[in-house]
């Protein structure tokens, strides 16, 4: 498969503070990566850096072999990076359908297809963003990211704070996206075993540095190492 994303020696942060140091990773088309670590180690920072929202101090970022470190966020999105932020970023003045159509790019993902995987959004298509439950907002955030028809989907804590029945619904959708959509996926998820079960490879961050990388299946079979790497102490 062709190289999609390459990050080499990335050092980045906010203002004068450094949140990531010397981070490297690579993804091919259709690949999947779990990004694990304790709270505050730089997982979300890595995703927002990929979206152009932090200050890159060193290292290289390549998208399909092209350096994209200087690209603004909208160009990254237009080039095929979909982002589901932890905060969801709903607009109270836009309806469900307007959230979807506002970012739409040509491709297999359409409003109708989003409604197929999330029928609840079809029922709420005329509702405003602030009229949705937390689970519905997360469905909309994922649907909106899919509407850019991404080659890479970034998921930041997609299950956080949701009822178990909603988690199961989202898990089914995300599993199908990882295994059957052809797009690459990076998942930040506090439930480490869940993230490992969904992905092919894993990196673990500690204090902004990569301290472990392996096949997800191998770490899933090694609970002692997993606990040592991600358990809260």
Positions of PLM-derived features:
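Conserved ABC transporter NBD signature motif
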Residues: 59-68, 79, 109, 113-116, ...
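ABC ATPase C-loop
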Residues: 145-146
């Amino acid at each position: 498969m062709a190289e999609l994303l390459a990050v080499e020696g990335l050092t980045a942060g906010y203002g004068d503070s450094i949140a990531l140091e010397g981070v490297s990773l690579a993804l091919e088309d259709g690949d999947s990566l779990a990004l694990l670590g304790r709270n505050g180690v730089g997982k979300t920072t890595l995703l927002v850096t990929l979206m152009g929202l932090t200050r890159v101090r060193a290292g290289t970022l390549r998208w399909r072999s092209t350096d994209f470190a200087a690209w603004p966020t909208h160009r990254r999105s237009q080039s095929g990076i979909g982002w589901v932020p932890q905060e969801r970023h709903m607009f109270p003045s836009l309806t469900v359908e307007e959230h979807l159509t506002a970012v739409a790019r040509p491709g297999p993902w359409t409003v109708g297809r989003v409604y197929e995987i999330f029928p609840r959004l079809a029922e709420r298509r005329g509702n405003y963003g602030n009229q949705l439950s937390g689970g519905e907002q997360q469905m909309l955030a994922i649907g909106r990211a899919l509407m850019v028809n991404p080659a890479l989907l970034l998921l930041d804590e997609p299950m956080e704070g949701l009822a178990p029945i909603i988690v199961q619904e989202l898990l089914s959708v995300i599993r199908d996206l990882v295994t059957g959509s052809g797009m690459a996926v990076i998942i930040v998820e506090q439930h480490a075993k869940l993230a490992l079960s969904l992905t092919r490879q894993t990196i673990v961050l500690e204090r902004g540095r990569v301290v472990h990388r392996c096949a997800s299946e191998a770490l899933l079979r090694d609970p002692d190492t997993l606990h040592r790497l991600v358990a809260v102490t």
